[in-house]
């Protein structure tokens, strides 16, 4: 017997020697935290506990010193987004607790981005702590929790800390109103109050009449104290209250997937990432254009350049010059907009009315105010007053010290403007009117009869300046520019102070060039870029070559050289455009090391951060989400494609199509036509924008290597993010919400839920349009792009896949206020959900050499969306989900790879309740002083990953037929690592290290399924999923 046991142990050791395990400890246990980390963790828990209630801890309240606005306390200084949040806080315009936070609103997303940067870029944890305490007491709790979770995730000194799950901190965001009222009614029933009969004493014994006269309220106080003591005993006897936190019919259809709280949190995180990655929208661009136009009208382009040079010459290197320049320019525009288009007498009348209202506020100083009015000594509003009054708005403005550097630069700018006005008046020989002329604005001291003459003179001056700037051939203007240039200080081209104004001047130069090209076109230009000839056919390089030869240009170059030059120029412009987009969108949100007190040189290539894979990650998550919806529908026998084919039947009339669509998406008939028309317009806009973007790219050059083909995927993803074409998915979501917010509304403020049929229909259509555009351009993979020589998959073994419906508990203590002081009552919501049994995948792979490889594992249904068995893999590939991607180092010979489902990195297990996290932290803090606490489990908090219990679709009692696709490919690492984080939302790090598309190889059409399955590095195996209960 002993010999048999030895043989078995020896065999197990031999097998284990050739096994490659990929089980990695992804979560740090609390028992390995240092004392400092435990104290920081306790601070985070104190902040988020009872987030809806006012902060009670005095030691935390003492840390509130306001929002820190010192640029030296932040890595990289304070940028425009952060400064906008600081200004909103000074004006008390940040989102407060009485307002609803929504990622569908642009201003809310901008506040989230700014608060996140204030927390993530804090120089030390003390700055982070003070800002968090101030924000905890002054802003919306949903906004604070989202920003804090992102900052804790991205900071280097908080990697060991966790934030409790959002669904426990803010459960009202994910529960229905009926569940919330049920929880609060249960708590009201436990808190008994004395009845009226008890208060008046009719049910009590009669007391001494003398005592009742001397102490009339003694009996009432005794009864109240007795009732309160009974309530405390009731609560002590029932510390755990369990309520049912689900709706009727939650296990029907796909509701187990769409109504799952963890999945709703994942979708909210995905939409939040979409909002944070969204580029400048049409609203922002229109605002920027309007600001530039107003600035050119009132100040003049020559004056702006001259003053910018003077300011940049005088500013020091250690000062945040870009912020000061933007502040002064913004204030000048606000001041001009306030008085633009108003009547002169109306301005004067309104100012005196504001002055009288100011007198009412200070009744004690009426005599002094009257004297100030008579003497003309009244407080000015952000400007210089000569011969007129400019009163009002001083109470709402932030106070600034008289020694502040901001006032120095703003005053110097205004002084230069006044001097230029005087010089311009002397040159033109105009008479000075009474009052101050600022930026060609009419003074209040001018007479009304002179209004038409002055306006005509100003219009003539504008036309003359515009003509001079457009033609650029007036000797006097050139001489004046030369004189200005001679007076400026010469600085190095790499000087940090020039970075902030280079982009603005570059845009102005481009506008000048475009205006000159309208009158004098250049000899060599981008001929016909984006235009179409011969009907709908886009212009090609050969057409441009014909135009060049027809005009007898570039005679010394051959046709091949001209075509090569056009192709090279187009690729350079495309690469430059992508780099500029990557710098503008999210270059500050990745982990970038900045020098303290200085802004990063975003225009320099050595610090440019490539993050274009972020758009691919978002698009990949959308595809995977739609595939899971399709899998759940197929598992429940809901035929999607059958209804789609009926809708697209050409024999049906338009009214019949509308009727079928109404039956499919089940929306209100009164708004059905508007919603469907809006969705149709969205689909058309997406197709047009993607077509325009891809027509500007030389697709023939991208059909070679797989790395080059990924650029098409990145371009399409940029369109969905709104970075190209201005038709991003957030714009689509906002439009759908606007048309669908009457009946389908949730407490997140977004207005949509994944269970909404309109949302599912829109997502499916968007993903289908994107896939069709990509497949039409790139086609399928070639055989050499799919095979891996010298590698063969011998066998793949999978455990039995089983799913079950179970009851899950959710901590709802933050949903209600604790009525009893000193007693923390645990309120638990019980909900049914779908879960799966943990399984393992064993793969036996043979390699002829040592090499790095990546293994992709896909899971998809064996049936198509019409319920047909035996459908081709090409018809079902869009319904496959990427279970895992593993990076391994294959050795020469046989390799056994063992993978557990609980080790998939982009999924998360059940979160630890807030009460349990707090208890473990406090026990560990005590253990640091006395003895270590043994047996502490790993804690799981908010991480934004996909819930692990939804990894498999709901099975069937007889077994749901599924297929497992395993593909082994050589690892093609990117030369420049685009995405550094090890784990991102919905995707693992192994897929990001590989240069192939994230959906490879099922993201392209499969023309020959047999040829694909005959490859030695590809294996397709049948599996079944059984529903236990």
Curated annotation (Swiss-Prot):
Q: Which GO terms describe its molecular function?
A: nutrient reservoir activity
Q: What induces it?
A: By ecdysone.
Its signal peptide is 1-17
Tissue expression notes: Fat body.
| This protein's GO CC annotations | extracellular space
Task: Identify the Pfam families for this entry.
Answer: Hemocyanin_C, Hemocyanin_N
Q: Signal: present as a keyword of the record?
A: yes
Among the GO biological process terms of this entry, one is: energy homeostasis
Sorted keywords for this record are:
Signal
Checking InterPro entries in the record gives: Hemocyanin/hexamerin, Hemocyanin_C, Hemocyanin_C_sf, Hemocyanin_N, Hemocyanin_N_sf, Ig_E-set
Superkingdom per UniProt: Eukaryota
In Swiss-Prot or TrEMBL terms, this protein is called: Fat-body protein 1
Q: Which organism is it from?
A: Drosophila melanogaster (Fruit fly)
């Amino acid at each position: 017997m002993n010999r048999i046991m030895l043989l078995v142990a020896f065999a197990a050791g031999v097998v284990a020697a050739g096994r490659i395990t990929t089980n990695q400890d992804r979560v740090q246990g609390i028992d390995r935290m240092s004392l400092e980390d435990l104290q920081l963790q306790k601070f985070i828990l104190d902040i988020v506990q009872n987030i809806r209630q006012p902060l009670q801890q005095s030691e935390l309240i003492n840390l509130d010193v306001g929002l820190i606005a010192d640029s030296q306390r932040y890595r990289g200084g304070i940028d425009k987004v952060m400064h906008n949040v600081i200004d909103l806080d000074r004006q008390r315009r940040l989102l407060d607790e009485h307002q609803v936070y929504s990622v569908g609103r642009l201003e809310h997303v901008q506040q989230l981005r700014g608060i996140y940067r204030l927390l993530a870029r804090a120089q030390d944890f003390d700055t982070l702590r003070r800002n968090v305490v101030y924000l905890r007491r002054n802003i919306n709790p949903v906004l604070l929790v989202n920003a804090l979770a992102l900052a804790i995730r991205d900071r280097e000194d908080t990697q060991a800390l966790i934030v409790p799950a959002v669904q426990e901190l803010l459960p009202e965001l994910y529960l229905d109103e009926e569940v919330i009222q049920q929880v609060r009614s249960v708590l009201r029933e436990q808190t008994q109050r004395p009845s009226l009969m008890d208060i008046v004493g009719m049910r009590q014994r009669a007391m001494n009449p003398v005592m009742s006269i001397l102490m009339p309220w003694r009996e009432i106080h005794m009864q109240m104290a007795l009732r309160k003591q009974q309530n405390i005993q009731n609560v002590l006897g029932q510390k755990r209250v369990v309520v049912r936190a689900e709706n009727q019919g939650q296990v029907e259809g796909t509701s187990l997937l769409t109504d799952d709280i963890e999945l709703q949190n994942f979708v909210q995180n995905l939409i939040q990432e979409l909002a944070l990655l969204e580029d400048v929208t049409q609203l922002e661009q229109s605002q920027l254009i309007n600001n530039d136009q107003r600035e050119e009208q009132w100040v003049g382009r020559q004056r702006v350049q001259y003053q910018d040079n003077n300011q940049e010459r005088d500013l020091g290197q250690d000062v945040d010059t870009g912020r000061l320049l933007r502040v002064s320019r913004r204030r000048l525009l606000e001041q001009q907009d306030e008085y633009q288009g108003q009547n002169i007498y109306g301005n004067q009348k309104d100012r005196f009315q504001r002055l009288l209202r100011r007198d009412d506020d200070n009744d004690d100083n009426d005599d002094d105010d009257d004297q100030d009015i008579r003497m003309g000594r009244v407080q000015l509003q952000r400007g210089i007053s000569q011969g007129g009054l400019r009163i009002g708005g001083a109470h709402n403005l932030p106070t600034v010290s008289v020694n502040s550097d901001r006032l120095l630069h703003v005053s110097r700018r205004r002084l230069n403007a006044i001097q230029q006005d005087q010089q311009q008046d002397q040159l033109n020989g105009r008479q000075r009117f009474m009052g101050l002329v600022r930026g060609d604005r009419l003074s209040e001291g001018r007479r009304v009869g002179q209004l038409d003459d002055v306006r005509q003179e100003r219009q003539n001056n504008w036309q003359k300046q515009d003509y001079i700037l457009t033609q650029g051939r007036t000797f006097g203007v050139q001489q004046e520019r030369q004189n200005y240039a001679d007076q400026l200080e010469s600085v190095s081209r790499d000087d940090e102070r020039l970075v902030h104004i280079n982009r603005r001047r570059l845009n102005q130069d481009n506008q000048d060039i475009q205006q000159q090209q309208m009158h004098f076109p250049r000899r060599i230009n981008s001929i016909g870029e984006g235009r179409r000839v011969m009907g709908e056919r886009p212009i090609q390089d050969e057409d441009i070559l014909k135009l060049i030869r027809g005009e007898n240009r570039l005679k010394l170059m051959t046709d091949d050289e001209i075509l090569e030059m056009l192709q090279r120029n187009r690729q350079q412009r495309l690469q430059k455009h992508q780099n500029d987009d990557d710098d503008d969108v999210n270059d500050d949100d990745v982990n970038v090391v900045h020098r303290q007190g200085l802004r990063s040189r975003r225009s320099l290539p050595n610090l440019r951060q490539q993050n274009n894979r972020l758009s691919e990650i978002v698009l990949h998550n959308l595809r995977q989400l739609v595939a899971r919806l399709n899998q759940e529908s197929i598992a429940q026998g809901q035929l999607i494609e059958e209804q789609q084919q009926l809708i697209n039947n050409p024999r049906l009339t338009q009214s019949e199509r509308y009727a079928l669509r109404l039956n499919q998406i089940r929306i209100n008939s009164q708004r059905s036509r508007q919603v469907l028309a809006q969705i149709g317009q969205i689909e058309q806009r997406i197709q047009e924008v993607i077509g325009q973007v891809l027509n500007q790219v030389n697709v023939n050059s991208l059909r070679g290597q797989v790395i080059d083909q990924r650029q098409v995927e990145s371009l399409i993803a940029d369109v969905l993010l709104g970075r190209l074409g201005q038709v991003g998915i957030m714009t689509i979501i906002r439009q759908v919400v606007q048309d669908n917010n009457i009946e389908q509304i949730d407490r997140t403020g977004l207005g949509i839920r994944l269970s909404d049929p309109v949302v599912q229909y829109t997502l499916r259509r968007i993903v289908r349009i994107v896939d069709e555009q990509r497949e039409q351009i790139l086609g399928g993979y070639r055989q050499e792009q799919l095979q891996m020589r010298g590698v063969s998959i011998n066998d793949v073994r999978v455990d039995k896949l089983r799913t079950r419906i179970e009851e899950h508990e959710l901590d709802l203590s933050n949903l209600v206020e604790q009525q009893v002081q000193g007693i923390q009552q645990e309120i638990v919501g019980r909900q049914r959900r779908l879960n799966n049994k943990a399984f393992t995948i064993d793969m036996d792979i043979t390699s002829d050499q040592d090499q790095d490889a990546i293994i992709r594992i896909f899971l998809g249904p064996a049936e198509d969306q019409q319920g047909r068995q035996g459908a081709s893999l090409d018809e079902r590939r869009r319904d496959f989900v990427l279970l895992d991607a593993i990076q391994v180092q294959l050795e020469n010979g046989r390799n056994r790879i063992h993978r557990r489902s609980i080790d998939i990195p982009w999924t998360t297990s059940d979160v630890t309740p807030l009460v349990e996290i707090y208890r473990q932290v406090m026990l560990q803090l005590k253990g640091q002083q006395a003895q270590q606490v043994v047996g502490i489990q790993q804690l799981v908090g908010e991480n934004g990953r996909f819930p692990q219990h939804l990894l498999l679709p709901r099975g069937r009692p007889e077994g749901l037929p599924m297929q497992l696709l395993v593909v082994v490919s050589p690892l093609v690492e990117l030369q420049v690592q685009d995405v550094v984080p090890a784990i991102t939302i919905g995707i693992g790090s192994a897929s990001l290290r590989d240069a192939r598309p994230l959906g490879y190889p099922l993201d392209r059409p499969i023309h020959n399924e047999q040829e694909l399955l005959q490859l030695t590095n590809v294996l397709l195996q049948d599996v079944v999923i059984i529903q236990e209960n």
